[in-house]
């Protein structure tokens, strides 16, 4: 086995590395720069402790997650299913409810809310791969958001969105566009 193959195996088994790469654009390596990223960037800290708590249910991870949640207003349920390569851009007041499914390479930005409703469209959202959810955007209900979708800031989405789309406004309007996330979702894993 070559060195490159062994690094790929480590990368595939350690989901924290994907989040690190998405948020920094750099391959994780043990060193001072990586440690500075981990300690300085609360989005990386939250992603790390969130993954750790989901995997181990440890008390230490729960305490760290609770502290970061309270300090930065990050309310992401441990019962949500989040794929690899989560990107928390300007991570303040982000809410992801119980039962939500996020695919790989999803960008969540300040003030976005993703959750269930208990009336007409009962259930939680299922969001595909390579999705950008802008500032103060809201996605609610038993909806399916396709892959390669950009949800613009301040949009309210409570309906299904097909692949390769841009969603704008409140009420939301869907525009079909190939490569909708080009330039928005970077460093994909």
What are these regions (language model features)?
Residues 72, 77-78, 83-84, 89-98, ...:
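Left-handed beta-helix
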Residues 1-72, 181-189:
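Terminal amphipathic alpha-helical/low-complexity segments used for targeting or macromolecular assembly
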């Amino acid at each position: 086995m070559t060195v490159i193959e062994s690094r790929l195996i480590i990368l595939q088994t350690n989901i924290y590395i994907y989040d690190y790469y998405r948020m920094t654009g750099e391959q994780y390596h043990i060193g001072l720069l990586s440690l500075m990223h981990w300690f300085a960037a609360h989005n990386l800290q939250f992603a790390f402790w969130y993954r750790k708590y989901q995997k181990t249910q440890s008390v230490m991870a729960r305490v760290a997650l609770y502290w970061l949640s309270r300090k930065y207003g990050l309310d992401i349920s441990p019962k949500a299913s989040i794929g690899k390569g989560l990107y928390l851009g300007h991570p303040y007041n982000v809410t992801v409810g119980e039962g939500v499914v996020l695919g790989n390479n999803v960008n969540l930005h300040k003030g976005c809310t993703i959750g269930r409703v208990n009336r007409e469209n009962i259930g939680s959202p299922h969001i595909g791969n390579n999705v950008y959810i802008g500032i103060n955007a809201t996605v609610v209900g038993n909806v399916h958001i396709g892959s390669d979708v950009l949800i613009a800031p301040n949009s309210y989405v409570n309906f299904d969105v097909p692949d390769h789309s841009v969603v704008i406004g409140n009420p939301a309007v869907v525009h079909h566009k190939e490569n909708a996330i080009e330039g928005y979702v970077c460093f994909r894993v």
